[in-house]
Amino acid sequence: MKRRTFIQSVYALGAWAGAKFELLAGAGPGSPSEPGRIQNDGSGGKETAVRYTLETLGEVLQFDASNGQLVSYRSRAATDQEFMATAKEDPVFTIDYLDEKREFRQLTSAQAREVKVTCDGDGAGKTLTAAFGRIADLDLRVAFQVKARPTEKFSRWSLTLTNDAGIQVVSVQFPFVVCAFELGGLGESVSLVLPSMYDSGRLIRHAPPKTGAAVIDRERGSLPNDSADAWHMTSGTDHYPGEQLAQFLAYYNDRAGIYLACEDTDGHVKQLKVLNRPPGLRLGVAHFGDWPNHGSRRLNYDIVLGSFRGDWYDGAEIYRAWSLRQKWATPLHKRTDVPTWLLDSPVHVSVHPEWDADLSKPTVIPKEFLPFEKCIPLLEKIADQVQAPLAVMMMGWERTGAWSYPDSMPWIGGEDSLKNTVKLARDRGWRVGTYCNGSRWVFRHKFSGYDGGASFKEHGGADCVCRTPKGDPVLEDWDRMFRSSYECCLGAALTRRIAVDQVTRMIGWGFEPIQFFDQNVGAATFPCYALNHEHPPGPGKWMTGKMEETMAEFRLASDGAGARGVTQSAEQGVNEYCLPLFQETDSRLASPGYLNGESIPLYQFLFHECIVITCMFGSAAAPYHMQIKSAASCVWGAIPGGVLTGDGTFLNKDTPHFSAWEPKGGSDEDAFEMVRTVTALRRGPGKDFLLFGRMLKPAAVDGIQMMEWTYEKQQHRVPSVFHAAWEAPGGRFGIVLANWTTQKQTLNVRHARLPGTKAGDTIVLQTSDRSLRVAPLPGAEGYRTVTLAPLSCAIIAVAAV
């Protein structure tokens, strides 16, 4: 029989329906707390659980007194809403290790031969301690503590592992938090926040629109299943610090939310995942590496659990408030390593001298781009239209096929032509740079016919390739449709030497914006289990250290050349720990309303410590791709950009960046105008907000027209106006709006930080359409009405007090 158990807090009066909670005597101040007994009134008083209760400012937690399992979690904002759906067989921690054959094995708390759980404290706070010994009859012990005070926001969790069994522990999963699929409240409000996804952040809703979006529903299989294999980190970038850009998860509905985070300031490697674990879903954390083969280690940081009310912005704000106090969070306006040319927000334009038309055909070399000097008049057309300087990113230049590092030299157009083109660009006030393909070794390219087996052997490639626990080379998987490549380990000296040599050579050509770590998503270091590299044989904090070491060598190369204008970037949002190492980050955002709607500007909300660019990437619906993408870049604080075509226009298609130029998509004139207006606002009155500021939770905006159309059999429904709230250094408040349509849009804006005006001089509306205009915007307190011209953007800026 399935029972629902309820608890009674000392803060609640009376018994809750369906349950009675008994406080046993003998738990006086300073003495060990006795467990409470939960009885079900409908079962004749039969005991169903023995529990310890811990309380914080915002929630009440209950633990099984026999094994320390978290069995109840209730927010004080919704005391009748149970978050937990813990099954009796769920462990409280798991340990993944490698056996003598270097195969993965897993141990759980349920295999402990000795278990002791105590709870000490009084009304001022309690500490739950659980100790587990002789796990699977090995000389292996785990102890964890949970500390909670009714005056503090979070419960704090810590764990210590003592390994005298001599096994190689790869990771420890802790805590074990299994939440209910159904939380009650408004069903459509149930949402999950994940600080990782290919564009910037992911929001999974319980009941999304009918667009194929993922849903929180185990029946539909939208979440991957929890299993031992799900936590085997042997390749890729899906970890922190890396593609997982921050260390928190949030799960909420319209009534309350649960927040889980690691407060790690030193870049220890971990994975945070949301997985299907019947009867609920699991908010999981695995802590990788640095566990001793002999001896003890306490986790170097706390895991915190707390509650919140609101939406994903409110959950993310909790994490941001902590993250911005850490060593990596130097505000952009205080950084001294960001060159002036980048602070001027040049429009980023990608040039592809080597073109794989649809990622299925042999390489094409466009005659319009070679020799490289032919690009200059085409770029001049772009610069004239957008009325801004350019950052020209050369892509697909490799002799052996696009993205075929490291055997890629010489450039297909020749180095002399390239250097001359860089000079011509610099004469016009532009910068030239490139994207590489990160720390991997391409040994075969289908489009160019390249076979690099001999080069791989000649240059000792095997010495720098990442290895699986069995010692096999790690083959990349996502790129197999057009090339074959190995992941390379930054913990191998050869990997770093080749990388530094290539970056040094590019600096010598005059390149300044360099994205070497393209495809190391989020500035990730690939995991490696090699026995002969400069690191322990498995993932761990060495990965963070080797990224720092590599970036320091890049900086020495630019300083040694006197190239102070060189910047480094990485694909997607640079993870928080690596923010000081990079000056810009290539965020491939998906615009509002795009397809499944899972993408959210989480990265842009959390971090603005390096400059965000969009360049050639980003998703937006056709045939208005450039207009929509540029409008989204505007309100989310990114430099706009696009792909150059042979007639000096942008590729205005929602397609891969290597797509064919013809037939054209959308209006070239509208694309130019949207980029121009966005850039004018960003470089002008919006600079303190969009460049140096911080994104806030958005205002309420009424009157936004939904634009609906069908194009190439794809239905689209996109808001006509995008908007975001921002705060400049010093506290000035502003609301940024962008109208990507060719129609005038009138909106009503509501926000508590909009003061009432008498003379109309407290708030100004600064618009960027055909000309940059500044005008007073009078109105009642908390309200303003705004009219946006077609293809325009604006900022409602509250004057400094």
Predicted feature residues:
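C-terminal segment of N-terminal export signals and the immediately downstream linker at the start
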Residues: 20-49
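Carbohydrate-recognition beta-sandwich/jelly-roll modules
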Residues: 54-65, 69-76, 81-391, 412, ...
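Active-site-adjacent "subsite" loops/lids of carbohydrate-active enzymes
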Residues: 438-505, 599, 603
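C-terminal beta-strand-rich structural cap/linker in extracellular carbohydrate-active enzymes
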Residues: 778-801
